[in-house]
Amino acid sequence: MSGHSKWKQIKHKKEITDKKRSQNFSKLLKAIKVAAKGNPNPEFNPRLRSAIDKAKEFQVPQDNIERAVEQSGEKDLEEVTIEAYGPSGSALIIEAVTDNTNRTINEIKNILKNMGAKFAEPGSVRWSFELSARDAGWTPKFKQELNESDSEKLNQLIEALEEHDDVQKIYTNA
């Protein structure tokens, strides 16, 4: 009967939930640190205001948000945009925030290779997206149709990329 107690089941579910929550917190706090570099006052920095609002939406504690704004000048974080091709030529734009660009790019290249996707040269995917002014995200100019198996492969690829600590957002045209 090992592993069948109610507490073991609750503990297992809680571990999974806490891990996802922790990953979300670290990604949101990195976004705040990068946004606060321009101006640490959210009244004059709309990007920071947006990042703080999103963090509050995910119930990040106020202490953590304030600490991230204070630390914005300490660590040298930079934004990286990576372009890739997924199953059936679907286009991907991966945005990441990192303190070591080479490490992050190599780790993402490795994930792409292991999942059967291809790293693309800068600009080779971006042409098929538009940068929207509202939420500063990428919207595809056209949709790529995928069959069921390729759609499943793309979902697995996106999940693998989202597990990477430095990856902030992933945009696809599928």
Where in the sequence are the language-model features?
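Positively charged, low-complexity, intrinsically disordered RNA-binding extensions
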Residues: 119-120, 126-174
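N-terminal cationic and glycine-rich segments that engage phosphates or anionic surfaces
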Residues: 1-139, 174
